[in-house]
């Protein structure tokens, strides 16, 4: 009786911890799902793309930046590129951020 109670408590606390399923393609996937029959398989060795590749000014696979005065075509502008100019001073991109240091739009 105690064993049955322990099993019931264990199932209540840890109802489903995931499983591995070998797909028709031969790939083994680890996942947590309620209905394993709904998983679609990929060809063996294939990787599912989550992002569209960049073409021109569209998205790239892993964009470094999307907008900002130090961003151009999803890439950071080189360090030293002028990003903001006033009559008294100029500000330059760092090459590490899409934001311009001391740019009024950052605040």
Swiss-Prot record:
Role noted for this protein: Specifically interacts with the alpha-1/beta-1 integrin (ITGA1/ITGB1). Exhibits highly inhibitory effects on cell adhesion and cell migration to collagens I and IV. Also shows in vivo anti-angiogenic activity.
Pro-piece positions: 21-64, 106-107
Compartment list: Secreted
Name of this chain's protein: Disintegrin lebestatin
Tissue specificity field: Expressed by the venom gland.
Signal sequence, start to end: 1-20
UniProt motif (Cell attachment site) ranges: 85-87
Alphabetical UniProt keywords: Angiogenesis, Cell adhesion impairing toxin, Developmental protein, Differentiation, Disulfide bond, Secreted, Signal, Toxin
Organism, as annotated: Macrovipera lebetinus
